[in-house]
Regions:
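Acyl-thioester-dependent acyl-group transfer interface
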Residues: 1-66, 74-101, 226-441
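Non-catalytic, low-complexity flexible loops and terminal extensions
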Residues: 1-11, 105-108, 117-125, 129-203, ...
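Acyl activation and transfer enzymes in specialized metabolism, enriched
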Residues: 35-52, 112-128, 193-230, 383-385, ...
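Short, charge-rich amphipathic segments
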Residues: 55-64, 138-158, 203-219, 324-340
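Short, glycine/charge-rich beta-strand/loop segments that flank catalytic centers
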Residues: 61-71, 99, 104-108, 143-149
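Short, well-ordered alpha-helical segments in soluble proteins
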Residues: 130, 134-138, 224, 285, ...
Length: 441
């Protein structure tokens, strides 16, 4: 490369990337099941067509002198069979490939995406565009690809754009929450997908005056109480990421979510009925998500990168502090439930895509052995339990609770295959832009 295009890391990625290493990275996974076997050559062509419109997706994480940053690349992502790499994390590497990977197996295609690139809603837009273009090519469309997407709008750091320098800042959450006694098994990731009809859970949630998220979180809480007796003596907290695109106008595919929390204090009891848990859970999220409180949280994120003292501290000193802060943030959560809502695909694409899945991924470096995620498509709610070991009792208890409530429940599993590996190191350009990136100027 004769030049060195780069982007300042988005505000949330400062924290996400602090724990990234050559053997681990915070990674989520999105899958689509087509009605035909995946063609990897056409998948690559679809990816090439999208590249000019989503520049931030074609970047990789780098350590700078003061801050991490994202180096844009002219290379394509790794595209391989699931037999080689299935659900493996995106790690720090020196081969200049983008921080996402595409894998395929029979009729399933999966995007493994580093959280440094974006969140589930932002990167999900790219994933939807990718499978849309793939489907067009599979159906014989071979003309020049033109998109209405604006690459500049897609790469905006929305946190920085909506940060108010003199605005009030939300306080840090310091409460310690119940955690399972987890044994992390090296490079293990076992997924259990729990599927149930969307209409059924919507109806039952409405009867109780709850959202679908509140209803399912209540099931998760009761499942914890049934799984571990120690949960009754601690505060149970489920972290629920909130998409800020419904509060602020932005088209960015980069990170723009904040954490909200659902708390339940058992006070020594483990025999709570679901109705009792509903009473406590109802309305908690709504109270946290006023426009005023959301702005305070955005200001809190922005105050980190705009702290005049922190800005001049070298990264080698700053990173251990950020790592500790990131782990501390997750000490206040028992687990995470990410619900991206309903996936609505274009009509022609929907005829070819049978189902979709969202996987929160491995959060063991945060101290969370099991995370959960959900997406609705084609009348089904698909909830994934991501385990970093083989202890699946919590998930099994939640399934039994759902069945006892009369839900039609189906389950299936997936497991990580292959190992983390990266390509050979490639030289980067030596130029003024690279120095600017390294020193974040």
């Amino acid at each position: 490369m004769k030049n060195y295009p780069w982007l300042k890391i988005d505000t949330a990625s400062i924290m996400f990337s602090s724990l990234s290493s050559p053997d681990w990275g915070r990674t989520f996974h999105m899958s689509a099941y087509f009605d035909k076997e995946i063609n990897p050559d056409i998948l690559r062509k679809a990816c090439e067509d999208l590249k000019p419109y989503y520049p931030s997706m074609f970047s990789y994480l780098k350590r700078g002198f003061f801050w991490n940053y994202m180096a844009l690349t002219d290379k394509m992502p790794e595209i391989c069979s699931e037999d080689e790499k299935c659900l493996c994390p995106i790690v720090m590497k020196k081969d200049r490939t983008p921080d996402f990977r595409l894998t395929y197996s029979e009729n399933r295609v999966t995007m493994d995406c580093s959280h440094s690139l974006g969140d589930g809603m932002g990167a999900g837009r790219f994933a939807e565009a990718l499978i849309t273009r793939y489907n067009e090519l599979m159906n014989g469309e071979d003309g020049k690809y033109v998109s209405t997407q604006n690459p500049e709008e897609n790469t905006v750091n929305a946190f920085a754009e909506h940060y108010k320098k003199d605005g009030e800042v939300a306080p840090d959450v310091t409460t310690k929450a119940f955690h399972f006694d987890e044994k992390y098994e090296n490079q293990n990731l076992k997924l259990i997908f729990v599927e149930l009809p969307v209409d059924e859970i919507k109806k039952k949630a409405k009867e109780k005056g709850l959202s679908v998220t509140e209803y399912y979180v209540s099931v998760l809480i009761q499942g914890m109480l049934k799984t571990d007796k120690k949960a009754a003596d601690d505060l149970i907290v489920i972290g629920v990421p909130v998409n800020l695109r419904s509060f602020f106008k932005t088209k960015s595919v980069r990170n723009f979510t904040i954490q909200s929390y659902v708390s339940f204090s058992p006070e020594g009891r483990s025999d709570y009925s679901l109705d009792e848990i509903f009473e406590t859970v109802r309305g908690q999220l709504r109270k946290q998500l006023t426009a005023e409180d959301v702005q305070k949280t955005v200001n809190k994120y922005g105050s980190l990168v705009n702290n005049p003292v922190l800005r001049i501290v070298p990264n080698v000193i700053k990173l251990p502090v950020l790592k500790k802060k990131q782990r501390g943030t997750h000490e206040c959560m028992s687990s995470i439930f990410t619900n991206v809502g309903v996936c609505t695909l274009p009509e022609e694409l929907a005829r070819s895509v049978r189902s979709v899945e969202l996987v929160n991924g491995d959060a063991s470096r945060y101290g969370l052995g099991v995370t959960t995620s959900a997406i609705s498509y084609n009348g089904k709610l698909s909830v994934c339990f991501s385990h970093t070991n083989n202890n699946t009792v919590w998930c099994e208890n939640c399934v039994e609770i759902l069945k006892s409530l009369g839900f039609s429940v189906n389950t299936h599993t997936r497991e990580r295959k292959g190992t983390v590996s990266v390509g050979a190191k490639e030289k980067e350009a030596v130029c003024a832009d690279r120095l600017k990136a390294y020193f974040n100027i």
